[in-house]
Curated annotation (Swiss-Prot):
PABS domain sequence ranges: 4-238
Origin species: Ruegeria sp. (strain TM1040)
Lineage: Bacteria, Pseudomonadati, Pseudomonadota, Alphaproteobacteria, Rhodobacterales
Gene: speE
Annotated catalytic residues: D158 (proton acceptor)
Top EC class for this record: transferase
Subcellular location: Cytoplasm
Quaternary structure and interacting proteins, as annotated: Homodimer or homotetramer.
Name recorded for this polypeptide: Polyamine aminopropyltransferase
GO BP term, example: spermidine biosynthetic process
Amino acid sequence: MTKEVWNTERLHDHFAQSLRVSEMYYDSKTEHQRLKVFQNGTFGRVLTLDDVVQTTEGDNFIYHEMLTHVPILAHGAAKRVLIIGGGDGGIAREVLKHASVEHVTMVEIDAGVVDFSKEYLPMLSQGAFDDARLNLVINDGAVFMKETEDKFDVIIVDSTDPIGPGEVLFTDTFYGHAARALTEDGIIVTQNGVPFMQGDELTNTMRAFQALFQDATCYLATIPTYVGGPMALGWGSHSTKARSVDLTTLEARFAAAGLSPDYYTPEVHKAAFALPGYVKKLFP
């Protein structure tokens, strides 16, 4: 009888999440972290970094759509987009669905993530790495953000959790450089974990955003493999204009974009900014 193999994630104290591994496709250590890709009966192919689930074939659409379409459609005229992280290509996939976006810069610290994602998780990028509008830069996102002189309409920080190489993407210094790199009406969105489990992540980001941006808040999306309730996606902008866009305008922009997402709708977009009390209490 074959012994069952499980991948167990222990990101949070006093709590673990296990996914059954029906087939292991990839298991190797890069310079920065241990990467695995395996098959799970519920979620399809699963990508983990140091055993922590990063994305899955089954539920990635929720995270990638909400981190992308919310800022781009709220902005309404985004032409230049910066992605920090996102080596699996899922964010790039969604950004490049917007024909109005002319140039995408994607900064990924680990070339190994990109290479094996192309080979083992092609369903995530769906050819995004071959799009002529995408400029892939292998560099530390914090270093790039400090040194860039370019301006961006939307900055999407698709980071890992604030441990290891992803830690610098949660600092006040990084956010300060990002604020400088935004256009006048630009928007930054960030991955800030699950507030019920990782409240400090949201508190620290909101403290930094409140000092840097006229509009600083978060919005929510529930992704099954990011356990503990809704995930917080940070939102910062030098203007309140984007977040106050009415539903009719969003619906018109959505229709013009010709999108057919599986999670995002203009109604979900507006509702995502309605925050429960326990999340509001995490704001400084």
